[in-house]
Amino acid sequence: MEETNRQKKIGGLLQKDLADILQNSLRESGRTGILISVSKVRVTTDLSIAKAYVSIFPSKHQEEVIKEINENKSQIKHEMAQRTRHQLRKMPDLSFYVDDSLEYIDGIEKSIKGKEDPVANPDLLDKRKKS
């Protein structure tokens, strides 16, 4: 089912504020060299749950940063509620997921440029076919 305009507006608002909060919390905790971005926020139709997809670079820090975010979920929700108190009546519950789509794209790009290029090595196509 397609998202309504209200869901899209709330998702965009939450995405912008979440990115700001997460970047500030990383900076305040003294962690440097880690880049965090919120790539997408999807809100359920009843506006009670917001799923935030977070990209973390370098990817070796993904698990520990997501764990840290989930441990501090209540503080993040409180900060979000303070920022959006004039736009939202009720703050949705937040759930965070790792967005690994950029890693997936990077893997495809590396395989095309590397030894697994089907244009340069047409024998690979026969090996990839399912029997």
From Swiss-Prot:
Q: Which superkingdom, per the lineage? A: Bacteria
Indicate the principal place this protein occupies in or around the cell: cytoplasm
- What cellular component GO annotations does this protein have? cytosol
Q: What Gene3D superfamilies does UniProt report for this protein, alphabetically?
A: 3.30.300.20
Q: Which residues form a coiled coil?
A: none
What are the UniProt keywords, alphabetically?
Cytoplasm, Ribosome biogenesis
Is Cytoplasm tagged as a keyword? yes
Which compartment or compartments is the protein found in?
Answer: Cytoplasm
Q: What's one GO BP annotation on this UniProt entry?
A: maturation of SSU-rRNA
Q: Which Pfam families match?
A: RBFA
Task: Give the molecular function GO annotations.
Answer: ribosomal small subunit binding
Task of the protein: One of several proteins that assist in the late maturation steps of the functional core of the 30S ribosomal subunit. Associates with free 30S ribosomal subunits (but not with 30S subunits that are part of 70S ribosomes or polysomes). Required for efficient processing of 16S rRNA. May interact with the 5'-terminal helix region of 16S rRNA.
- How does it associate, per the subunit comment? Monomer. Binds 30S ribosomal subunits, but not 50S ribosomal subunits or 70S ribosomes.
* Family per record: Belongs to the RbfA family.
According to UniProt, the name of this protein is: Ribosome-binding factor A
What organism is listed for this UniProt entry?
Answer: Christiangramia forsetii (strain DSM 17595 / CGMCC 1.15422 / KT0803) (Gramella forsetii)
